[in-house]
Each structure stands twice: as C-alpha cells, then as structure tokens.
Amino acid sequence: MTTTYDPFHPSYLDESDLREEMDRVFDICHGCRLCFKYCTAFPLLFEYVDSFDDQDASRMTPTQQDAVVDECFQCKLCYINCPYIPGLHEWAVDFPRLMMRAEQTMVAKHGTSVKEKLQNQALARTDLVGKVNVALAPIANKAISKPGSLTRRIMSKTVGIASQRILPPYARQRFSAWFRKRTTRQPATVAGKQGKVALFPTCLVEYQAPEVGKDLVRVYERNGIECSLPAGQRCCGAPWLHNGDVAHFADQARDNIKVLAEAVRQGNDI
C-alpha cells in the first residue's frame, strides 16, 4: 500500500496498491463522517460499509469502490474541511486526489470507450470551445441557456452534460481581449512599495466571467500593483486530469509553467 498522489510515482497506477490505499482511506472516512453532506460519494461509501456486520471498509468489492469513485466530481469541499490532510496529520488523507488516482488507474488498465473518448475530447478542449462560443456568444447562450431544451438533451446524449444543469453563459469579449485593449494600464501611485503580478485568468474568467478578472485588475491597480497578462497561457489542463489523461494534462501544465516561470523571473508574483 502506497500513499502517493504523484501520477509519476511507480506505484501510482498499480491497481492492487490502489485498492489497499482505498481500503485505508475509506475506513478513516467511515470513522469520521464529517463529509456526509458534501457530495453523494460519502453517503454511498457509508452505506456500503454500514451494510457489513463488522463495518470493515476492506470488505468493499472493487465494483463498490468504483461506484464511490464515480460519485466524486472534484469539488474538493471534503479536502478543505478534512482534519487528516497531508502536512497536518500522519494519515495524509487527500480524498479528491485518491479519487483522481483511481480514475487514472482505471483508464490506464481498461482504456475508454469510443463515446467516452469523444466526450473527453469535447469537454477537455476548453480553449477551443471557449473561443468558438465567445465568438458566437448570442447564438451559443441561447442554445445552452434553457435546461431541458432540445439542444441540451442532445448535448446530454453526445457530450454527457446533464440537460438540467444550469450552465454559465459565455461573454461577448474574452478577458484577455479586454486587458490588451485597455488604454490605461499603469497602476495608481500609492505610498509604499509597488508590486507586480502576472495574471493566470482561468478558463472561467477568460471565457465566461471576465468581470471577475476586470474587478481584480482594478483593485490591484488602485492599490499600486502593476498587472500583466503573459501571452501563451492555456487551460490549466484539469479536464484532462479528471478524465484520467495524465499525458495531455502534463503537456498543458508544462506550457503554462514555462510562461509563468518567465513572469516570475521578471519579478512578478502569480
């Protein structure tokens, strides 16, 4: 059994090692139960373990373990509130990253279906999807704004986005476009040392909520902090990682690290 959350660790994709680690963590979670209200993964986990007379989490079958994994959607509320996380406790529990390890192990062992591959390609290419939908914002927003509509039902069948889920609308202008078109970029002069930051806007701010980034820039500049937006940034790659595709995630992470590392060398905070 190896407690590791490093996707390049030699035991990371070892299924038997993973199953033993899930036994350990599930037993801790069952004894704690602090996270019963955060997502359906925990009530399902507790239901399985409670069904055993001795309440031994290691008696869960691989199918039951996988069912718990499927319920996790990486909101990370459990991690924020967990008293046993790495660095704070010797048990080093990181439930979201363990679920991610399980997803990646299953993909490495069993692969994915053609439908899943197509869905992953559609959902993980957030920069492409974002650029297209911002350019067609009036049309795109009308198409996705009504839960349960024909368009949303088609999306549910094809790319796997639940038809009843409320989706954030796309902006008519990307955050990066707004930032580079501004006529006044210099921060206000204030007493004390002036700082410098390089912004990493995230896909949500870049394509759907640029007002969040705009407010951040205005607050920083009002307080004498110079803002820059390094060119060449990409999606953080989280959709690839959550789909079990470490290779694509690592490619995007390397690109972002290269860009942001240069910004740090120029004296910026991120």
Place the predicted regions along the sequence by residue.
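Short, charged low-complexity linear segments at domain edges
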Residues: 1-20, 40-64, 193-196
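Mature N-terminal segment immediately following signal peptide/propeptide cleavage
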Residues: 21-37
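Iron-sulfur-cluster electron-transfer modules
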Residues: 23-26, 56-235, 240-270
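Short amphipathic alpha-helical segments enriched in leucine
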Residues: 27-30, 40-44, 221
